[in-house]
Amino acid sequence: MISISQNNQSFWIHADQVKPSKQADYEQVAKDFIEACTKYNLKDSDWSTARIDDGTYLTITPISNMADLDKNTLAPLFEKMGEEKFRSIFKRFNECYDKHGDYIVTLNSDLSYMPNGLTLNTEGQNYRKWHFLYVTPSNSQALREKIKAIKDLYAKKGAKEYFRIYHSGFGTMGEYYLAVISAKDEQSYAKLGDENEALLGDEGKKLFAEMFSLLDKYESKTGVMRPDLGYTAKQ
């Protein structure tokens, strides 16, 4: 479970683009790795895992600042497991993909709409819809203001569709804002979306049209959170 320790919490994202034939193997080695972390009581490491429908797995780790990237939090695990066992796990990981990478995103509390409290832990709502709003530098501030106007309309109307807004950072090519919506499943997401569109009415349609006119590119992705592939250190 990831807690939000500050207003604009940053996250280190590690993405593994897993081969279609290797996804079961990848999940098994991920579970074996978590079992080792639990067995040896690895400290100072917490991450959540999401799976995008295209087979990309995201390991999501909260960080306080860029200096956190220099910390080798796995060093105690290496020492307790021994080099051979430790390296064998990551060798198994590497056999599951040809491409992987890292980047930073920051959760923006001012733009996110969760009236009952900003949290990533949406229990019973592991379905995810990611809306990527790519923008050029010349339109970045205008897009931010438009997202804020949409949030304000949601609040005024008492919308039941909640969203979190992230902003791209270090390690990404181009700039984007990312709206993340949680739901029980795809059907629940679609139903809530239809209800929300009706609630916001013409005012909502106008704001979204104005927002889309500012974008350089838009894309959406679907997937699920995988609590069984995440890890929380014991306190």
Model region roles, listed by residue range:
Residues 2-205, 209-235:
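Short S/T/G/P-rich N-terminal loop/turn motif that feeds into the first structured element of a domain
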